[in-house]
């Protein structure tokens, strides 16, 4: 019988782009583990993705996972966009490279190991675990120690 786990995630960015962080809670029965890290220059979407990735990659066996996020970007990316991106070789409908492809590919690989139920929660609406993840993410963003090597700044028109 597969273990049933709950994951709660949030990402934060002080400026977008700017210093950012993620926070996640992984819960199995009475056991809880938290994850957080801060990056010097990143985006809120990258931090939302990292929160889900890191917590899923921490699982050592196939699990039934309920993953809660307040990110529409993550939710829509997984439930609506990713299948077509993969079919098109990680290109958008406009034939442009998918933003944050490095993280979408990591998330896709992490998801393939588990049975996932996605839950969207409204951010900053009093959901206790989401609020804790937000606190972890903001604290990490305020004391960043890591480089987000996959972050690619937008090209600006000159």
From Swiss-Prot:
Residues 1-142 form the RNase H type-1 domain. SUPFAM superfamilies: Ribonuclease H-like (SSF53098). Its cofactor is Mg(2+). Mg(2+) 1 binds at residues 10, 48, 70. GO terms for biological process: DNA replication, removal of RNA primer. Its main location: cytoplasm. The lineage of its organism: Bacteria, Pseudomonadati, Pseudomonadota, Gammaproteobacteria, Enterobacterales. Its EC number is 3.1.26.4. It catalyses: Endonucleolytic cleavage to 5'-phosphomonoester. It holds the Pfam family RNase_H. It is an enzyme of class 3 (hydrolase). Monomer. Keywords: Cytoplasm, Endonuclease, Hydrolase, Magnesium, Metal-binding, Nuclease. It is found in: Cytoplasm. Belongs to the RNase H family. Binds 1 Mg(2+) ion per subunit. May bind a second metal ion at a regulatory site, or after substrate binding. Mg(2+) 2 binds at residues 10, 134. GO terms for molecular function: magnesium ion binding; nucleic acid binding; RNA-DNA hybrid ribonuclease activity. GO terms for cellular component: cytoplasm. NCBIfam families: PRK00203.1 (NF001236). This is Ribonuclease H.
